[in-house]
């Protein structure tokens, strides 16, 4: 019985590490494509991946309209997915300033749906 718990624990750990990796890669690709000067962004550090049910269509619309400093204005986003979203915070250095953004991703962790 103890072996089963260990196997389940290891499987869950590996699955969560895989999700974190895919989320980080999706965010990095989004930043490279949509930052005004991605070469000026250094020392990227990611928090743990989380899920949220508290983001609805109207909040996503507001985040998309506002964007964030140092990012392009006319960013092309995917359609708003149904259900829970994942979020990932990225802390980074931009020209000596430490900044942070939160990115919201679809359930497949392939696309950034919105960010703030």
State each model region's role:
Residues 1-17:
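Sec-dependent bacterial lipoprotein signal peptides
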Residues 17-116:
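Cystatin/cathelin-like cysteine-protease inhibitor module
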């Amino acid at each position: 019985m103890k072996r089963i718990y260990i196997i389940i624990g290891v499987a869950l750990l590996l699955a969560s590490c895989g999700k974190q990796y895919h989320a980080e890669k999706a965010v990095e690709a989004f930043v490279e494509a949509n930052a005004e000067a991605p070469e000026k962004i250094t020392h990227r550090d990611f928090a743990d991946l989380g899920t949220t049910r508290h983001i609805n269509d109207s909040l996503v619309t507001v985040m998309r309209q506002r964007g964030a400093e140092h990012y392009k204005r006319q960013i092309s986003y995917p359609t708003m997915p149904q259900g829970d979203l994942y979020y990932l915070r990225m802390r980074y250095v931009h020209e000596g300033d430490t900044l942070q953004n939160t990115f919201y991703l679809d359930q497949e962790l392939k696309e950034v749906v919105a960010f703030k």
